[in-house]
Amino acid sequence: MKVLRKTIFLSLAAFLLLSELGCGDQYRPVANPIVGPGGQPQSVHFAYVLNYNPNGNGSTTTIDVSGDSVSWLQPMGVGPVYEALLSLNGLFVANSGNDTVSDFPAYSNGAVTTVGLLSGSHPVFLTSTKNGNLYVLNSGFTPDMCPSSGSVSNIVTATGAVSNTACVGLNPVNMVQAASGGQIFVLNAGDNMGQGSVSVLNPVTLELVKTLNPGDGLGLNPVYATSSVDGSYIFVVTQGDGVHPGALDILTQGSAPVVAASVPLGVGPTYSYLDTHLNRLYVTNAGDNTVSVFDASNVNVANSPPIPSLSAPVAVGTTPTGVAALKDGTRFYVANSGSNDVSVVSATSFAVLKTVAVGVGPNFVATEPGSTKVYVTNPRGFSTSIIQTANDTVSTTIAAPPQVPGCTAACALQQPTMVVTQ
């Protein structure tokens, strides 16, 4: 059950959602635009909402930021759980249910291409900071390649071909590539009798550089990882085990990566987000309803603490699972899945300025580059809420597409799991 718990807690919340599919009566939200004060002019931007379908292929909804309207709907594979936007190569989606990755142009209603993976791969995560490459994290066993562990595959984005696949640990749940094409760090939930490990891979060859275990100073139950802006450090969120508390481990990359330092977190940390504008790291602590905020510009593993906290943990709503900051540096937004709302927090005073009611079970939040809109996916509410930042109110609620294409009445809806913007 420990491994299952970690998988469900994996933010991005694809796996949080999977535990809730098919539960209860389905609420069917309707788009309800609210006219904002004076309008909010902006450049052309889009938000891409990933929808899970328990009864067929999933989809991606593309929303025009300027009009809060659906521009197009693209079909994905079976069981889509994660999406990644590569500026030069479009949007990629990991389809765990049929061992594929979908790709389509991000700026137009273009054709969807499909990259096939090895049978049994069950892709769950995507990452890349290296032009021309997309790394796919596969949680399943592949009899012809990795019959007793997970794996990482490298897709050459120009051709859509898988160039290499390498074995990692058991039940990998998350990974990150260090900035500027650095090493790849894979979090394996099933290793060491469920205590976890981190596999460090060469990004060119996918050869294993080192495996970091609890005996090397790694905290128990690693669940999420984020790279520093310059790639010097990898920040790994570990949940602990009920006896050992959660912690933020700071890892180095290179020929001999190590767990260089660690700082305590709140109870039940699940997710981290790097605000590249202010160079801050945010960690959601779902167990005690707080967010930890760190100064990621001032990391020194020889100091105590090795990464300074900018405030006491910020008390937010119930069960925070997602966080994102405005590019203008004024506020950050926290999705609280247990209280069905979003906390709006000042980036200077760290005071909660407002609590915004959204749909049921909000799990993921993203801001668009113009800092005018915030997008919140509500998987149990079958909707996406759009918050207008001029007054921090919900301007529009967009219903998810029907599970059965073409359905027009009393339709069961798909379930939005995450959103990315450009």
Task: List PLM regions with ranges.
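Bacterial N-terminal signal peptides that target proteins for export
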Residues: M1-S11
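C-terminal motif of bacterial Sec signal peptides marking the signal peptidase cleavage site
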Residues: L18-G22
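Predominantly soluble domains enriched in secretory-pathway, periplasmic, or organellar proteins
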Residues: C23-Q422
